Regions:
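Generic structural motif
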Residues: 14-18, 35, 87-88
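Acidic-basic catalytic patches of nuclease active cores, encompassing PD-(D/E)XK
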Residues: 1-19
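Catalytic cores of nucleic-acid endonucleases
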Residues: 40-65
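Interaction modules related to DNA damage response and DNA replication/repair
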Residues: 19-26
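A conserved beta-strand-loop-helix scaffold within acyl/acetyltransferase catalytic domains
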Residues: 65-137
Length: 137
């Protein structure tokens, strides 16, 4: 928990209050961030602002992805215009590596995999399943 508190205070400038082991971090321009330790319920969280709930297990497993997401939501990342980007088909390893490093949900196997590139940097991936035909009766 201490590493989460120090990150939010030093990097994003979020202040926090604690209640029943649930920590609420507030930011003037960004969303409220709620850190929920393992074994704690989050269903009683009431906020009038946009709220992000971060569970302790996600923080421990995918810290880098959570940090990047919080930085993006608090305006600490560089914006790139979509017209300056290129879309290319990517392989399974590239998609899996990117999602394991930068996405809190990780990777799932799909049929179509595309990368969004700015210059030589992979900024995002888009994954799509094969088209399915449903029979109606």
């Amino acid at each position: 928990m201490a590493d989460f508190q120090s990150f939010t205070q030093e990097i994003t400038g979020l202040g926090y209050v604690s209640s029943d082991n649930v920590f609420l971090f507030t930011h003037q321009q960004g969303p409220d961030v709620v850190f929920v330790p393992m074994g704690t319920m989050d269903h009683n969280i009431d906020s009038e602002r946009y709220t992000i709930i971060i569970h302790e297990d996600v923080w421990k497993l995918r810290t880098h992805a959570v940090i990047n997401r919080l930085k993006a939501l608090t305006g600490q990342t560089r914006r790139v215009h979509g017209r300056a980007c290129k879309i290319k088909r990517i392989d399974q390893k590239t998609a899996a590596d990117f999602l394991e490093n930068y996405h809190t949900g990780g990777y799932i196997n799909t049929y179509y995999k595309y990368g969004i590139y700015f210059e030589q940097d992979l900024l995002a991936v888009a994954l799509f399943a094969k088209c399915r035909t449903f029979q109606t009766t």
